[in-house]
Amino acid sequence: MEQKKTRVTIVGSVYAQPGTQFVYMGRADQCESCTIARVCHNLESGRRYEVVAIRAASHRCPVHHGGAVTVDVAEAPVEMRVSPDIARKNTTIVVKFPECDEACETFAACHPIGVVEGQKYIITDVLEGEAAPCRTGPSPVLVRVVPLPEGLPRYTP
């Protein structure tokens, strides 16, 4: 079984359940005077995380009604649609969202929340399913991606 790299952070108590996913959106204004804010804000903005374990520590928090809890999180895989040219398992890609409008029925799948444009991801699975219509290019393919782990060699052309 693959061991996910985890980080200790603090989340609102309503999110402190294994399997809960969230997208870290950054620091709130109320965090400026908090003495433990550094632990809450050790994640990368815009990335999707999954709670994998709960720790015993709980904290009062001006942002989260009901307080906050210390947890272990790992970056969560995200399903998205990509060009069929790059939809290959175990391929590293630099995400570039297609230029289309929000009226497109596959816009959310091609521009998923939790994926940061310009960052490197690994396609872990090419998922079966119906082809999605696309007005700006070839029908995008549904894949599962994870961020390129830190410490792996990064090729930069």
Curated annotation (Swiss-Prot):
Domain of life: Archaea
InterPro entries listed in its UniProt record: UPF0179
Membrane-crossing segments per the record: none
Pfam families (UniProt xref): UPF0179
Classification via HAMAP family: UPF0179
PANTHER family per record: UPF0179 PROTEIN MJ1627 (PTHR40699:SF1)
Family: Belongs to the UPF0179 family.
Protein name as annotated: UPF0179 protein Mhun_1135
Classification lineage: Archaea, Methanobacteriati, Methanobacteriota, Stenosarchaea group, Methanomicrobia
